[in-house]
UniProtKB/Swiss-Prot annotation:
Gene name per UniProt: srpG
Modified residues (N6-(pyridoxal phosphate)lysine): 48
Name this protein carries in UniProt: Cysteine synthase
Binding site for pyridoxal 5'-phosphate: 78, 183-187, 278
Organism, scientific name: Synechococcus elongatus (strain ATCC 33912 / PCC 7942 / FACHB-805)
Induction note: Transcriptionally induced in the absence of sulfur, requires CysR for transcription. Part of the srpG-srpH-srpI operon.
Amino acid sequence: MSTSGTFFADNSQTIGKTPLVRLNRIVKGAPATVLAKIEGRNPAYSVKCRIGAAMIWDAEQRGLLGPGKELIEPTSGNTGIALAFVAAARGIPLTLTMPETMSLERRKLLAAYGAKLVLTEGVKGMTGAVRRAEDIAASDPDRYVLLQQFRNPANPAIHEQTTGPEIWEDTGGAIDILVSGVGTGGTITGVSRYIKQTQGKPILSVAVEPEASPVISQQRSGLPLKPGPHKIQGIGAGFIPENLDLSLVDQVERVSNEEAIAYARRLAQEEGLISGISCGAAVAAAVRLAQQSEHAGKTIVVVLPDSGERYLSTALFDGIFNEQGLAVV
């Protein structure tokens, strides 16, 4: 990232430096400290801004982008929005494939940034979106550049270079437990590499996945992978991403749809943090750990991937809006 004087060269350069905020009321006097990394403060309001910028910068540096080239990528929403804001800032055409079950706000944001959106069957999840993107790229390989967020090494690398050092600096190296939902695997892999390998601190790295689609747990147990539908947008892709380094994952916590929604609502109402469903899942796991006696006195850092505004049309806010007599937008 670079600046000219006191201003940034373009909006993609403004990623990172997100705040770390202590959770208070939601933790209910647990013996551990829980700190939330608020990734919704990134320029397009999610943790994926980091990888969106990093993957495009990397493609530019490797000479993959230029006249006549277009980006193509599968997304559950946040990566697509991140790529869209960077592509707009740098003048690159972008096509995105996304399951039709993702929130309406995400689709509107993508259109607002000028991206072309191709919807895929919701029942096929991210696997269907990935296959559709691969088919489009293969149909005209001289035109399309597929960034492949699930296997692109620039993804975990940007977290190793930025997110990890930010957490380390802001905690003064006092982090004991990292809690992160797993979508592409880039966040937990990159942050864990930095803290465990670069700083040499043996933290407990905890992956969070949907209870209804526990493929990481199945993989670690040597069981056949049996993904299932769930409502926690942004995590639980239904397969093991290449960017997820399981050797760095010490524990897996499974969270139900209901827990994720309940904790996302509590974050807004008890901590003043309007948060997405995957944030609720991560915090549900973090609070669970914080309440365990073996973690007394420890510092838990939980990554909150995005902001809640892009979920206003989902089940996350249904009950609240109905109680207030408000129509879901």
